């Protein structure tokens, strides 16, 4: 008689914004030299990993979330399994992803899902992979994945995957607005490459439009997203949304990562709610969330064992 599995593992996968994203150069290896400040948010997806079923399976409430090997969750599972010295097929497991973080938005939803899958599947499969090895697996999957294993406010350099924890930023309410189209990371960096190669000079000159509205603090006055100008050149609506957040009281507003989502930081929840209500409508979706400290991120993304 086959023994029925007694428990599953559930974990939240928070989103992020990039408070600053400087693209400094194209590296000899083809990647980009970056200097970015990641900031974790309370908005999150939820992953539930259940043993059993027919092979390794991904299911989601969002049809835009791939269910095959192209999903970073699948790649994370394979790397974890191999890192544990295992061979052959992945264990029969169903990973259910409840998506709340939109895709192709610059909010790191897929990368956060992968980071959470590494932790959840290590627990479910009971594989002997250390925290240090898990971090290395995260870096191999991408800078955003490595960040989500840390959380809070973090500086990323080189490819964005060499991480240095920073003092947590002043807590803020965050309004996220996504237009009814996405921007792929590959496209955003490709557009930056075109401009950089055409100038054959430092990219700093193209960054003047990256800063849309600075806060009253000196630190935030230096926040710039170098991907914003080339993306806005193709999608001017993104800049209009950034400017609208500023008009509605955001102390800082910008595109997050490679877009297409934009964010605004607010001190007061009521002000943030009013801005969200005014910007949500036909062709846009808006969310209200908040920044999280490193401790809050780890509490939010802790592993939970549930009976099945």
Model-derived segments and spans:
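Short, basic/glycine-rich phosphate-binding loops at helix/coil junctions
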Residues: 54-66, 117, 139, 213-224
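ATP-binding N-lobe of GHMP and related small-molecule kinases
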Residues: 1-105, 123, 127-132, 169, ...
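Solvent-exposed alpha-helices and their adjacent loops that cap or buttress functional pockets
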Residues: 2-3, 40, 139-140, 146-149, ...
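Conserved, helical-rich catalytic subdomain that frames metal- and/or nucleotide-binding sites
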Residues: 148-150, 155-252, 267-308
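Glycine/serine-rich anion-binding loops at beta->alpha junctions
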Residues: 96-125, 143, 251-266
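Solvent-exposed beta-strand sheet faces enriched in polar/charged residues
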Residues: 20, 50, 59-61, 96-98, ...
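Contiguous, small/hydrophobic- and glycine-enriched helical/loop subdomains that border
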Residues: 114, 118-158
């Amino acid at each position: 008689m086959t023994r029925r599995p007694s428990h599953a593992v559930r974990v939240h996968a928070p989103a992020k914004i990039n408070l600053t994203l400087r693209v400094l150069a194209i590296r000899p290896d083809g990647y980009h030299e970056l200097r970015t400040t990641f900031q974790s948010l309370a908005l999150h997806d939820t992953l539930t990993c259940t043993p059993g079923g027919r092979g390794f399976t991904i299911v989601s409430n969002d049809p835009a979330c791939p269910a095959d090997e192209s999903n970073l969750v699948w790649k994370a599972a394979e790397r974890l399994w191999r890192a544990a010295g295992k061979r052959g097929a992945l264990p029969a497991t169903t990973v259910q992803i409840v998506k709340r973080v939109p895709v192709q938005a610059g909010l790191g939803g897929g990368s956060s899902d992968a980071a959470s899958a590494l932790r959840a599947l290590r627990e479910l499969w009971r594989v002997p992979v250390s925290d240090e090895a898990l971090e290395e697996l995260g870096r191999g999957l991408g800078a955003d994945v490595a960040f989500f294993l840390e959380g809070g406010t973090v500086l990323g350099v080189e490819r964005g995957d060499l991480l240095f924890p920073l003092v947590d930023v002043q807590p803020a309410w965050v309004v996220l607005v996504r237009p009814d189209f996405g921007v792929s990371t590959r496209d955003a960096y490709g557009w930056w490459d075109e401009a950089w190669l055409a100038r054959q000079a430092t990219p700093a000159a193209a960054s003047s439009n990256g800063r849309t509205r600075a806060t009253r603090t000196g630190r935030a006055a230096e926040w710039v997203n170098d991907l914003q100008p080339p993306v806005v050149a193709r999608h001017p609506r993104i800049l209009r949304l950034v400017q609208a957040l500023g008009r509605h009281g955001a102390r800082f507003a910008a595109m997050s990562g490679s877009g297409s989502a934009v964010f605004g930081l607010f001190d007061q929840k009521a002000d943030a709610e009013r801005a969200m209500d005014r910007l949500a409508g036909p062709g846009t979706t808006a969310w209200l969330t908040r920044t999280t400290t490193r401790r809050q991120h780890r509490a939010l993304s802790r592993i939970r064992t549930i009976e099945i």
